[in-house]
């Protein structure tokens, strides 16, 4: 049962537009959220995914502001997060409202992102980060930052699962970006830490202990963050500021603070025409203030601005950092690595990015990262491709999953796919010539690596990716599987 603090209701009533009803707001807060997903177009087309899952009984209702987003209806026995398709990274379970900020940043499809350098200032768990990576088609550079140590691991796991390869991960208080990467980014998403007032439909206790006195402390951090973002933004660049909270002080007032600080250099962009019906949530400034009852979603706030003029630095330029541990790969190793990936997996490494080496490790960096090297410390850049062995290479799961052509995998059926994801070997029905490292796939999408030994496929799935619980995405198959268990 949802817990709405009466003090919260009294406070938020001051910010609610006159055309909205408090009774309706309270009613919608008590309703469970409709499950929603975003198809990962880095791994499958939206049309192919819909066709594939319609055959399994899934029903889809389009999210108006995201071409790849859908509210879904599935059988109660289907656990979305435990399906093979979810583990493969074919879709992300993402609340519909949280698909809005990336759409606001890029209202039109990006035709060519190779020259773009983006920053996602508060990335975890990765829904918007991976949405941006898909919109960029893994081109250009996306710097994904997360301050919380406990959430960095979750961010990396989701980035890896979704096959995003154009990322560089950082782990900082995002207030440093304006100083260390001054006017370095073409576009920035700041999904700011907030009071979370819009999440009560997902977390019934989110507002149980709501305290108005905490808002100013949160808003103070948000003001610092939006200033840092603005300083890190190139002149002419776009900044989207968003929260999952509802009060004005964490939303409109933070944006107006930036305007008051930097004046005519800040130009607000209206989002009233972002999608059909967006005007229902539009404010006088052109921001979107999404109350739960407007679109039957979580509460959210989204603002977009353009930096129309350069601004002065507010601190000295930091000294360049030294001792970067990576060097460009030598010519001989480069040729051997490229030949191996081409022969084994059909992956053409040339033209994909910058090939780098650290000791016996080989990495693929996004092309645009070089100007940022030495200005800030990265936790991880791009993809680790392989480790060098005495003879040959040991390929990395995440690299092959992100780069390999969909048609290259050894096809498995659903039962075999589930066995594989549980860490088990796959027996072959007839003995064949051993083929070494290979990919296995299910429904045309990759599952991971195996070693083809002739009589079986030896599982090479990293141990941290092995799952104990996996369910079928088909209600009928789930029932059959359950019947077979004792």
Curated annotation (Swiss-Prot):
GO terms of biological process kind: rRNA base methylation
UniProt GO molecular function: RNA binding; rRNA (cytosine-C5-)-methyltransferase activity
Residues at the catalytic site: 244
Domain of life: Bacteria
Record PROSITE patterns: SAM_MT_RSMB_NOP
EC number: 2.1.1.178
Pfam families linked: Methyltr_RsmB-F, Methyltr_RsmF_N, Methyltranf_PUA, YebU_pre-PUA_dom
Keyword Ribonucleoprotein: no
Catalytic activity: cytidine(1407) in 16S rRNA + S-adenosyl-L-methionine = 5-methylcytidine(1407) in 16S rRNA + S-adenosyl-L-homocysteine + H(+)
InterPro entries xref list: Methyltr_RsmF_N, MeTrfase_RsmB-F_NOP2_cat, MeTrfase_RsmB-F_NOP2_dom, Nol1_Nop2_Fmu_2, Nop2p, RCMT, rRNA_ssu_MeTfrase_F, SAM-dependent_MTases_sf
GO cellular component, one term: cytoplasm
Keywords associated with the record: Cytoplasm, Methyltransferase, RNA-binding, rRNA processing, S-adenosyl-L-methionine, Transferase
Subcellular compartments: Cytoplasm
Record-listed S-adenosyl-L-methionine binding positions: 122-128, 146, 173, 191
Protein's job: Specifically methylates the cytosine at position 1407 (m5C1407) of 16S rRNA.
UniProt similarity note: Belongs to the class I-like SAM-binding methyltransferase superfamily. RsmB/NOP family.
Cross-referenced NCBIfam families: nop2p, PRK11933.1
HAMAP family with a match to the protein in the record: 16SrRNA_methyltr_F
PANTHER family: 28S RRNA (CYTOSINE(4447)-C(5))-METHYLTRANSFERASE-RELATED, NOP2 YEAST -RELATED NOL1/NOP2/FMU SUN DOMAIN-CONTAINING
Designated name of the protein: Ribosomal RNA small subunit methyltransferase F
Protein's organism: Shewanella loihica (strain ATCC BAA-1088 / PV-4)
